[in-house]
Amino acid sequence: MKKIKVLWFTNTSSNYSVGNNEYNGGGWISSLEKELSRKLNIELGVSFFGQGQPNIINKNGVSYYPLTVDRSIKSKLKRFGSIRQQEKSQIDAILKVINQFNPDIIHVFGTEKIFGLITSFIRIPVVIHLQGLIIPYLNAYFPPSYSFVDLLLQDKSFLKSINSYIGFKKSAKREKEILQNCNFFMGRTDWDHRISKLYSPDSKYFYCGEMLRDEFYLSEPWENKTLGVVIQITSTISSPMYKGADLILKTAQILKTKTKLNFEWNVYGINEMNLAEKKTGILSKNVSVQIKGVISSSELCKALKKSHCYFHSSYIDNSPNSICEAQMIGMPVISTNVGGISSLIEHNKTGILLPSNDPFLAASYITQIVNNQDFAIELGKNARKSALKRHNKELIITDIIKAYTSINESNE
């Protein structure tokens, strides 16, 4: 059977640089690449924007095409103020790689970057793998009581925060163009499926689960009976306001003042909560919230196994791998019911769903899980069973190859 040549465009270098300890994002793409590259009927190329001089290599049967754009002062001055000029420079670099690899199918991971715009420049079929979606994320960018003014409160980083928000709005505008011009999508939640149909009604959607990092497949299941006396709650978030640092602080304060729980709330992925502390008037140190920064996947896996529950605080999300990883090791998960999360959690069966910005209900559910071991164990067992099926590597590879075959046949 003739090989299908597939060219990936990714936001990370995937397995191009082995040994990097990525924590937030990208790890599942590396896992998918490793498994897919073993299939004899697929020839895989991977392209991404990187720093320095590009070094095209072939490793473990995968061709890597790092992309660079002219970053000279002269070039920057020429492009200054012209987003379209910047995009043209990047599109030219992307088209050069496409001509070099000559793929049957192009697989773009995410709509956050420029890669999805290439549908207007080529006749090769392009499938976009939906990840986070900027347009609905922009709608939830400021949590209740937050506004653009709060960007000015972010100490020395306020200029960076303002630039980030402006860039986010520009990316949302570009994402609209990308979604409207794409005929094929891959996704994994009812939410991303519906949004793809809103913007491209005649498009074809393929369900495709995501692989997790290896540590979570290999981990021994979570056991409630081995946990310590001090209640451990774990969350992983990033810096945007919509990730819900304020909800963590408010929930922790309610646990402190309204319950007798002796707890520590460990928050990974960030180094400070300054803005959330200012907005809520709650200092993390006063409510037993400990900010742990970025850690490796193996360290996170160990931390989760020592925790009584995982809490996801975001105001918008599609299918956060942090939830999936916690479910995979079989621990109880509490999450806001936003975006695509209801496709991951069945309330009171594989986890707990609650309205965003409801710290009272959050505190109540945490208390229930801690005080009712049978309930916690049942949630964890059900979650693990669901996650093992959802993240089955062979099933994911089968689904993705079926999608590639269908797309390739539709183009013949």
Task: For the regions a language model picked out, list residue spans one by one.
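N-terminal subdomain of nucleotide-sugar transferases
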Residues: 1-58, 62, 253
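Conserved acidic donor-binding segment of nucleotide-sugar-dependent glycosyltransferases
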Residues: 347-348, 352-359, 368-373
